[in-house]
Amino acid sequence: MKLIIKNLKKNFEKKEVLKDINFEFEKGKIYGLLGRNGAGKTTFFNCLNEDLEIDNGEFYIEDNGKTRKIQPEDIGYVLSIPNVPEFLTGREFLKFFIEINKDKIKEIKTIDEYFDFMKIKKEDRDKLLKDYSHGMKNKMQMLVNIIASPSILLLDEPLTSFDVVVAEEMRV
């Protein structure tokens, strides 16, 4: 499987942010985007995730010689600023996420097994997400993407707010 990007272009008014991006991402490989603040890395992700309308170009998946349009379930996205339902507890959020995605999840584990995997302490599991730290919210965001197991996982500076132990484990 490959994610193919052809002639991607994005402008904000007169400022050209993405100019004729052409690239193929192969399954099983990890790619990194390097650049200064404002270079267009997050804009690139937002275009790919269809959160921003592109000015030109196309992206699609090629699998076994066949091409198809990217579907929303193909992409998981871990934002640099966590986006979680703060009115739920961590446990309620995972339970809800698993329930609405149960037909798509390949191997469902217990909620506590997921918490253990991300090193979320027992005393934090039933706290409201609004009371989680930035790093804890990021863990939850990463966890639902691990559970969903999308074909494409976009990580926008995901490890910056993780504690050192979890960040190192995620790199492995």
Which residues are covered by each model-predicted region?
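Conserved structural motif at the start of ABC-family nucleotide-binding domains
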Residues: 3-5, 18-20, 72
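Helix-to-loop junction immediately C-terminal to a conserved catalytic motif
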Residues: 49
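Conserved ABC transporter NBD signature motif
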Residues: 56-73
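Catalytic Walker B motif of ABC-type/P-loop ATPase nucleotide-binding domains
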Residues: 153-157, 162
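The feature captures the beta-strand-to-loop junction immediately N-terminal to the Walker
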Residues: 31-36
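Conserved ABC ATPase "signature" region
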Residues: 95, 106-124
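Q-loop/switch helix immediately C-terminal to the Walker
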Residues: 81, 86-102
